[in-house]
Amino acid sequence: LRFFLADKPDAIVVEFFSGSGTTAHAVFRLNRQDDGRRSSISVTNNEVAANEQKALRESGLRPGDAEWEQWGICEYVTKPRIRAAVTGRTPEGQSIKGEYKFTDEFPMADGFEENVEFFTLTYESPLRVSSNREFAKVAPLLWIRAGSRGRRIDDISRGWEVTDTYGVLADLNLTQDFLNAVRADEAILLAYIVTDEDRL
């Protein structure tokens, strides 16, 4: 990755079929080497290996069951690996032994100064989202689109909210209050309007 991203400290790396999370791990390491702020988005389908699927089906389990999903590559390999890379600790809480080698040697137990979020994508009813009953489920996507920096807006029950780099307006009757808050903060780069109002 260094060959392609060395001169792109703010790059966004998207990997589909991310497997064990090697690309995200490499982005963390590259950021540490050059103080970059690259983001990595890893997408996987949490596939369970064919031989394990057979045994799980024979025991009465099906895709979607928690006991099935725990053996998928994302749940069993990717998430634990990424958490361990960032924290420097195993899933059992022990410091990781060993050091990273070559370009920059340092203990794996040091971890990385990275923010990590895991999301399970689902299909949501537009009516429930537009009426704010499911806003928390789309909130992470808005935060990612706004740059994945700072606090995430998870609740807009008061009609609007502003955070470090973006704002969300849900009640058009409160537009002026929202605009005043946005104007008062030069760091805000993006505003979302979440509504089903016909007057727009």
What are these regions (language model features)?
Residues 1-11, 31-200:
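Accessory, often C-terminal, charged low-complexity segments
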Residues 10-19:
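Conserved class I S-adenosyl-L-methionine
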Residues 21-25:
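Glycine-rich SAM-binding Motif I of class I
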Residues 26-30:
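Hydrophobic residues on the short alpha-helix immediately C-terminal to a glycine-rich phosphate/catalytic loop
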